Design a protein with these regions (language model features):
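Helix-loop-helix junctions and helix-breaking kinks within/between transmembrane helices
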Residues: 41-52, 93-99, 170-171, 195-235, ...
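Transmembrane alpha-helices of multi-pass inner-membrane enzymes
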Residues: 56-59, 221, 367-439
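N-terminal signal-anchor transmembrane segment
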Residues: 1-64, 83-89, 379-381
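Long extracytoplasmic/lumenal interhelical loops at the membrane interface
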Residues: 152, 163, 282-352
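Aromatic-anchored transmembrane helix interface
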Residues: 71-84, 92-115, 133
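Flexible juxtamembrane loops connecting transmembrane helices in multi-pass membrane enzymes
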Residues: 159-162, 236-249, 259-298, 320
């Protein structure tokens, strides 16, 4: 089933590229498609992410911005990425040297977006990410209702099974559903669209039983709240910017109603949710298979970390530690990354990985008041349990988080910016230049 989804995904992307390049507004269309590709997992051509290929094609299109002021971010990012990738040549336990090339390709793709993305490009990319996340969630709901054939995971965890959507496993579905929840809440949408997008992603975020996504969402909300308090305490009182609140109350009401109906119709679901939430607090129980596996893997990674030289064991070395903590020293292991991105990168690169780790965390915190910054924070927290740092989504969010703070210096003020957004139009996810706060 996974191969079928990947095949359909690859064919759809290729056909979409052909259609986009013949579209009158092909730059906006390809920007949207770039956001869609960032929401896919494992769609590659000769081990090159479709996201990277589309970024190169997108660079060749006319138009866009010239964001010269972003170079101060790209220089440290490029240095950190090259330093970490160099461990593929130095490490003694490198499992797949091509992972270094994939990383450099993703960083290069992010650099392209940073240097050339305009406000409208960024908006289109976020829309593409929202659409593909919601499609994945919709497929997950159809799997739960048996309308799409699939093998539901972990019936011992959930009485109705854990859907996978268009992704290889439920944890990834949960992460992308969380991305969809944040985007549908923050972006300006018509009331009906906000309800549909929010409800679809929220329901799947719950039904996927992905604890990493739950923790990440709560952690992101707490950091956003802390940032808001700090900002108000350190800045003069001014006109308060109101976000796109249209439809939020309706979305909350729909989520409450749908939850009540689901819990009433399937009483076992309530017990499953309570038990799943309880496993996030306190000691991991013996029957918590995924929790026990994560503990064993982290223990093995810690043991491996005790022996790292200054440049680590080499990028992808952490992948030699299996899901249950077994260490595969000979041959090529199936995985190339660890579940915990920070611990895995330390095993891979040790001090050579620290600059990249520090850059990602710092960028997420500095941009926590923007939409891309909040999404990046969510993905990084989730990646402490299910590593998505080597996925395109992390790097498009890195690029958009950088440009979220630089946008006002990059492109001329357009007539739309000076006159306001026309009635019925969807506002940009970034504030106009006169704004005193990030969205």
């Amino acid at each position: 089933m996974e191969s079928l989804y990947l095949g359909f995904g690859s064919a759809a992307v290729i056909l979409s590229v052909v259609a986009v390049l013949t579209h009158p507004d092909r730059r906006s269309a390809l920007s949207f498609l770039l956001g869609v590709s960032a929401g896919l997992v494992g769609v590659q051509v000769f081990r090159i992410h479709i996201f990277t290929i589309l970024a190169v094609i997108w660079l060749c299109l006319p138009g866009g911005a010239v964001n010269r002021s972003s170079a101060k971010f790209l220089a440290p990012l490029g240095f950190a990425a090259v330093l970490f990738a160099s461990t593929a040549l130095l490490g003694d336990l490198v499992n797949s040297p091509t992972l270094a090339l994939q990383l450099l390709g993703l960083v290069g793709s992010a650099a392209i977006v940073v240097l050339r993305a305009s406000r409208e490009d960024a908006k289109a990319m976020l829309w593409g990410l929202l659409v593909i996340s919601t499609i994945g969630s919709a497929v997950g709901l159809l799997q739960v209702f048996k309308l799409v054939p699939s093998d539901l995971w972990h019936l011992q965890i959930s009485a109705i099974g854990r859907p996978t959507g268009i992704y290889p496993e439920p944890d990834w579905l949960g992460m992308y559903a969380g991305v969809g929840v944040i985007l549908s809440w923050r972006l300006a949408l018509p009331r009906v669209a906000k309800v549909v997008f929010s409800l679809t992603n929220f329901m799947v975020l719950v039904l996927a039983m992905a604890r990493a996504s739950w923790v990440a969402l709560v952690g992101t909300l707490l950091l956003v709240a802390c940032a808001a308090v700090i900002y108000r305490g350190t800045h003069a009182v001014g006109p308060r910017l109101k976000g796109p609140r249209k439809g939020r109350l309706a979305a909350i009401a729909a989520a409450v109603l749908a939850s009540a109906v689901a819990l009433t119709a399937v009483p076992q679901l309530q017990e499953d949710l309570v038990r799943r939430i309880s496993t996030m607090i306190g000691t991991v129980q013996e029957d918590d298979i995924s929790g026990q596996a994560r503990i064993r893997q982290n223990d093995s990674l810690m043991a491996l970390a005790d022996t790292v030289p200054v440049y680590g064991h080499g990028i992808s070395a952490a992948g030699r530690v299996g899901a249950w903590g077994q260490f595969e020293a000979v041959g090529e292991a199936q995985n190339n990354v660890a579940s915990n991105w920070i611990l895995g990168m330390w095993v891979d690169g040790a001090w050579f990985a620290v600059p990249l780790i520090a850059f990602l965390i710092t960028l997420a915190l500095v941009r926590i008041r923007t939409i891309p910054g909040q999404l990046l924070t969510f993905c990084l927290i989730s990646s402490l349990f299910s590593n998505a740092v080597f996925f395109p989504i992390t790097w498009i969010l890195v690029a958009l988080a950088i440009t979220a703070g630089q946008r006002r210096h990059s492109t001329p003020v357009t007539e739309q910016e000076t006159a306001g957004v026309p009635a019925g139009a969807v506002p940009r996810p970034y504030p106009p230049r006169a704004a005193v706060a990030q969205p």
